[in-house]
């Protein structure tokens, strides 16, 4: 079983209340984009204004924090907004409480948006499919705690490790756009899945987009045919919704 030690540093979480969306479908245009976020050592930065990926940078790149041209970033299954610990923009995220991105929503008050105010252990180096590979290398990195799944490692009173001491397990504190539980490796349970949640993302300049991740393993053409590939993400978005 592959266990990943996770820790969380809280820097004052903004409350995430849910305004009630209007029940009628909107007439907005829904865009669909595929982002290659398979690399463990990079974040991929996307601009809603430009409708495309505009930068790819190493996970600890400091210069990207001063860049206000990006709005949302992807690292495997972790997400950032241009705000707080991740950037100097006016970004943030809000969980709408619906699963249909075509449903009209109400943009909440500014204080309902949560900036990137937490860090969590993220894998920055790992070799898939190599039984001799070293354990994953992790580092505490900033992320958005609404768009990303937040976890902690707790003692599992029902199991013991090889040394006879109590084993640990992953506790999911919040489900973001994509959920991953590495405890499920080698079991019949899914290791990763989609929450199917719709979010409002506030951009670096204070505008708003609606977003929903609809695939976290988009197929890639290989010698074996179309192969589902973890970290190949497809998301839908509507911009602007102001």
Locations of the language-model features?
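Bacterial N-terminal signal peptides that target proteins for export
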Residues: 1-3
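Surface-exposed, beta-sheet-biased, low-hydrophobicity segments with strongly acidic/polar composition
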Residues: 19-242
